[in-house]
Curated annotation (Swiss-Prot):
Localization per Swiss-Prot or TrEMBL: Nucleus
InterPro entries in the record: His_deAcase_cplx_SAP130, SAP130_C
GO cellular component: nuclear speck; nucleus; Sin3-type complex
Assembly mode: Component of a mSin3A corepressor complex that contains SIN3A, SAP130, SUDS3/SAP45, ARID4B/SAP180, HDAC1 and HDAC2. Interacts (released by dead or dying cells) with CLEC4E.
Keyword Ubl conjugation: yes
Swiss-Prot/TrEMBL GO biological process terms: negative regulation of cell migration; negative regulation of stem cell population maintenance; negative regulation of transcription by RNA polymerase II; negative regulation of transforming growth factor beta receptor signaling pathway; positive regulation of stem cell population maintenance
Residue ranges, compositional bias (Basic and acidic residues): 67-80
Protein name per Swiss-Prot or TrEMBL: Histone deacetylase complex subunit SAP130
Source organism superkingdom: Eukaryota
Tissue expression remark: Expressed in various cancer cell ines.
Entry keywords, A to Z: Acetylation, Isopeptide bond, Methylation, Nucleus, Phosphoprotein, Repressor, Transcription, Transcription regulation, Ubl conjugation
Phosphothreonine: residues carrying this PTM: 355, 856
Claim: Acetylation is one of the keywords in the record: yes
Length: 1048
């Protein structure tokens, strides 16, 4: 993987307002310049965007539809692929790496592009240059010889596989619709990989794209897609992390079926898609799956998705459309390739070579993706998921794993990825503001099969990006649908990105176990803010069971992230969902799923189906500020997972902001912090409304999804029982209803399958009736509230209401509440906070949990500090994007870093100050007997004094060095000041004095070191006697024992 190439034909300059931004799409693996002529469609710009922060963004305005350009590109790509192939397998797809540039968000202004125009970038999947290309054209789907070139991942990709995927011609299309103001489009990069069809237009972006990516930050402003290119592996992760945006993909409800129906359709669809406006895409393109990757980060929002894996995809086909809540149109379609596409979905579009067979392989290959790519971002994970379901194997793939309908499956996959992205939305409605953005969803879900991916590559994104965890989707699990969910648990995420403790990791795989990483430790507070971390890219397999396990920590993490919310996030709880992710899966929501509820409401209860994110916006998108909405929609498509994911992501951002709110629900301190949360809550509600759009798409998906998700749900529910009991109750039944529900509630629906469902059962109709109903806070709210009150944690009722928003909300809310509650407890520590049984020392009691490591300031924060903090957080202006599309993010001044400030032991005071004599006991010194010493292991070695000799040798070297310096100084002195002329010149005199002083120092040092060395070696004077004693005493005993054994 070479350094990024300079912009070439692949580079696209966004037209229109975004003129400043350019995308560069590079083949991830190859550096060679593309052979094909520059595509006409793309305008070339000599400069790269990468440098500027804006690179990440792609101008929504620019649209590159040229097929001819694409073709040329394809041909070039093919050359490339042939040029080197790491693997002979055709299936390999080459991941496209999109490198998000963190600064991008800020730098570029977002210009709204004509809403209609889609931007598609076709380029070989080379790593994108820093600039983010909106779309990749995976080229045509021809299967070129796949060279597997490693793409350069942005983030480390844990597995080497990253490079694996050869580049396959695939296109990623990113659709952004600037027009959507409020949603702030996040450019979505859609990768439409057609695996098989070379000619498909990859640009699914329809003109309207609708912003498939929603800009997460400002509701209105588009997000940068900057990070949107998908990088393979680390890059993807990074992208994810950086971008704030979240894309929401919303599958069309009907499409999904259609999609499943015929893989072939995809092709057709593709082309049509091109021409068709984005809006249509969502419906029209059933076959195509849209994977939107949204990077959650503003920056790299979307990578999205890969082509559908063909077969699976096809089934899945449901295209995801990213719907912005604001603009409903957005959709990203991933055409399902022929079903066979492997759909590696590796982020990069995978070549999908066109053969369907690959699909099966893809699973294996997927690994590649997964391994190699952390791509958290949309990373094709979504697609992957589909594919991943290996069992599905080929087209049927829909097959078992996926959702009942293939579409679902695909969705799932995409879903995580997209929604993950979506989730990411930057919205940080909450005061959190900046930090929030990190929430960017990290959900890149990489469903990649590859378990190996076990850890998604973590992507470190900026703080914003959380890493999604990609769950491995295990095809075996039925939950596969949900599987894809991303959890945003920061916790889970493998430690890969520990750094962001906060990020949520999306867990994509439902089945796999989730690896918990306690990322969140720090997260709780900042998590959201920091949000970035986390991202663990690693995929975690969630096991439903595991999930449960996770959930506590997850919750915590999430919470951390969300502070509490996340934790409740149910995802933890959510975990209940069968897909481990389920919780997330719950709803497509995925992460949220269980959380979903939370999400909305959850906020408090992170559990919320929707986003676990604190925002709790109904739609994840909303949640995240702008992007969130998208997520929800996506989730629908994914049915369960996606939606959730989106939400989650958003959530997380919100969480950051909201964290407190969420937290409030969960832990006491958080509760105290409630005020901060309050601020967030309102946002949540708003967000919620956004969610509405989601509902529609959801429906479709949910139906398909429904089955599996539902199934998954119950298990999940059970798993998290403690937290989710209520949820479960609601959920289970609902789970069946879930289908209806899913359809209904946009975001939740899927997740609803689980979560939503829970709430939904009755509501399902409601939901179906309309998101708005769902949204209608009243009903859900009530439910939530009830839940909340019992939970106590739910405290932030308002947050819950948002959940309510989601239709799921009610149930979800409950779930969330339940979850959240436990979760809330969890956040502070891995486990829920308990009141100490005994009165601890006064001091420790004052300090708060004695052992809480994180307790630092946080711990203390009582209502008062919380309020203060909340105010402080709120004080900076909220992020906003000005008319020119430039996004302003308030930066919270951080206290200077000192060694002491960040290390404070909350329990130390209690240890060193005693209230009663009995607290102190003199330690009795035990004198070692000679025999005991002699029997110690390695005692004879120590007696030899090897350490002393080693040290003595080093001291000798020091004296030799000093001697050498002394000699040089002597020569210098003689050379500069011959004879006694020194006195004549002041300067010479001064130099002479300095030399003389240094010589004296050298002598002194040599003498002292030699003396020290000699006295040190005297310790060994008694060596012989000591060894004699040791041998006499030590061995006798040992020998006697051995002899006894021998005798026996």
């Amino acid at each position: 993987m070479g350094p990024p190439r300079h912009p070439q034909a692949g580079e696209i300059e966004a037209g229109g307002a975004g003129g400043g931004r350019r995308l560069q799409v590079e083949m991830s693996s190859q550096q060679f310049p593309r052979l094909g002529a520059p595509s006409t469609g793309l305008s070339q710009a000599p400069s790269q965007i990468a440098n500027s922060g804006s690179a990440g963004l792609i101008n929504p305005a620019a649209t590159v539809n040229d097929e001819s350009g694409r073709d040329s590109e394809v041909s070039a790509r093919e050359h490339m692929s042939s040029s080197s192939s790491l693997q002979s397998r055709e299936e390999k797809q080459e991941p496209v790496v999109v490198r998000p540039y963190p600064q991008v968000q800020m730098l570029s202004t977002h210009h709204a592009v004509a809403s209609a125009t889609p931007v598609a970038v076709t380029a070989p999947p080379a790593h994108l240059t820093p600039a983010v290309p909106l779309s990749f054209s995976e080229g045509l789907m021809k299967p070129p010889p796949k060279p597997t070139m490693p793409s350069r991942p942005i983030a480390p990709a844990p597995p080497s596989t990253l490079s694996l995927p050869p580049k396959v011609p695939g296109q990623v299309t990113v659709t952004m619709e600037s027009s959507i103001p409020q949603a702030s489009a996040i450019p979505v990069a859609t990768i439409s990989g057609q695996q098989g069809h070379p000619s498909n237009l990859h640009h699914i972006m329809t003109t309207n794209v609708q912003m498939s990516i929603i800009r997460s930050n400002a509701p209105g402003p588009p997000l940068h897609i900057g990070a949107s290119h998908l990088p393979r592996g680390a890059a993807a992760a990074a992208v994810m992390s950086s971008s704030k945006v979240t894309t929401v993909l919303r599958p069309t409800s009907q499409l999904p079926n259609a999609a499943t129906a015929q893989p072939a359709v995809q092709h057709i669809i593709h082309q049509p898609i091109q021409s068709r406006p984005p809006v249509t895409t969502s419906n029209a393109i059933p076959p195509a799956v849209v994977a939107t990757v949204s990077a959650t980060r503003a920056q790299s929002p979307v990578i999205t998705t890969t082509a559908a894996h063909a077969t699976d995809s096809a089934l899945s086909r449901p295209t995801l459309s990213i719907q912005h809540p604001p603009s409903a149109a957005i959709s990203i379609q991933r055409p399902a390739q022929s079903r066979d596409v492997t759909t590696r979905i590796t982020l990069p579009s995978h070549p999908a070579l066109g053969t369907p067979k690959q699909q099966l392989h893809t699973m294996a290959q997927k690994t590649i993706f997964s391994t190699g790519t952390p791509v958290a971002a949309a990373t094709v994970a979504p697609i992957l998921a589909t594919n991943t379901i290996p069992s599905a194997t080929t087209a049927g793939s829909v097959s078992h794993t996926q959702a009942p309908t293939s579409t679902i499956v695909t969705m799932t996959v995409p879903s995580h990825s997209s929604h993950a992205t979506a989730v990411t939305t930057s919205n940080i409605p909450v005061a959190k503001v900046v930090p929030q953005q990190i929430t960017h969803t990290s959900p890149r879900i990489q469903p990649d099969y590859p378990a190996e991916r076990s850890s998604l590559i973590p992507i470190s994104g900026h703080r914003a990006s959380p890493n999604p965890v990609a769950m491995e989707t295990r095809s075996d699990n039925r939950p596969s649908v949900p599987v894809q969910f991303q959890y945003f648990l920061p916790t889970y995420p493998p430690s890969a990105y520990p750094l962001a403790a906060h990020t949520y990791t999306p867990i994509t795989s439902s089945v796999s176990t989730i690896r918990q990483y306690p990322v969140s430790a720090q997260a709780p507070n900042s998590a959201i803010t920091a949000q970035t971390g986390v991202g663990v890219a690693s995929t975690v397999h969630l096991n439903p069971m595991q999930l449960m396990t996770v959930d506590a920590s997850h919750a915590r993490h999430i919470q951390g992230i969300q502070p509490a919310p996340i934790s409740t996030q149910g995802i933890q709880p959510a975990p209940i969902g069968t897909p481990g992710i389920q919780p997330a899966p719950l709803g497509t929501q995925g992460i949220h799923s269980a959380t979903p509820i939370n999400t909305q409401g959850l906020q408090p209860a992170p559990m919320g189906t929707q986003q676990p994110q604190p925002e709790g916006k109904t739609s994840a998108v909303v949640l995240a500020d702008g992007a969130t909405i998208v997520a929800n929609p996506i989730s629908n498509p994914f049915s369960a997972a996606p939606a959730a994911t989106t939400v989650v992501q958003t959530h997380s951002q919100s969480a950051s902001t909201n964290a407190p709110a969420q937290g409030s629900s969960p832990r006491p301190s958080i509760l105290r912090k409630k005020p901060a949360t309050d601020g967030a809550k309102p946002k949540s509600e708003i967000h919620v409304s956004m969610a509405t759009p989601v509902t529609v798409s959801m429906e479709t998906v949910s139906n398909q999804n429904n089955d599996q998700p539902t199934i998954a749900v119950p298990p999940t529910a059970q798993q998290p029982p403690p937290t989710i009991p209520t949820m479960i109750a609601a959920a289970s039944p609902p789970s069946q209803p879930a289908v209806a529900l899913s359809t209904i509630p946009g975001a939740v629906p899927i997740t609803p399958p689980i979560t939503t469902i829970a709430a939904a059962p009755p509501p399902s109709v409601t939901v179906g009736g309309s998101l708005s109903s769902v949204l209608g806070p009243p009903v859900p709210e009530i439910k939530v509230k009830e839940e909340v009150e019992p939970m106590d944690i739910m405290r932030p009722v308002s947050a819950v209401p948002p959940l309510a928003t989601n239709t799921v909300s009610p149930s979800l809310a409950l779930l969330a509440n339940n979850l959240s509650m436990p979760t809330s407890d969890l956040p502070p520590g891995a486990s829920p906070r308990k009141k100490p049984r005994k009165q601890q020392h006064v001091i420790s009691t004052e300090e708060g949990d004695m052992m809480e490591t994180n307790s630092t300031d946080d711990e203390k924060s009582t209502a008062k500090s919380l309020l203060v903090k909340a105010e402080k957080r709120k004080s900076p202006p909220k992020e906003y994007i000005d008319e020119e599309g430039v996004r302003y993010v308030p930066v919270r001044p951080r206290p200077p870093i000192t060694l002491l400030r960040h290390y404070r032991n909350p329990w130390k005071a209690a240890y060193h100050h005693f209230q009663r004599y009995s607290d102190v006991r003199v330690k009795e010194e035990k004198k070692a007997m000679l025999q005991e010493i002699a029997n110690q292991k390695g005692v004879s070695c120590r007696a030899q004094g090897w350490k002393v000799h080693l040290c003595a040798a080093q001291l000798l070297q020091l004296t030799n060095l000093e001697h050498d310096v002394y000699e040089r100084l002597t020569n210098l002195q003689e050379g500069i000041i011959p004879k006694k002329k020194a006195a004549t010149d002041d300067d010479l005199h001064r130099i002479n004095e300095l030399i003389q002083g240094n010589m004296q120092r050298c002598k002194l040092v040599m003498d002292q070191i030699s003396e020290a060395r000699d006295s040190m070696l005297k310790v060994l004077d008694h060596k012989d006697r000591v060894l004699k004693l040791l041998n006499k005493n030590g061995t006798v005993k040992k020998v006697s024992k051995l002899k006894r054994k021998e005798k026996v």
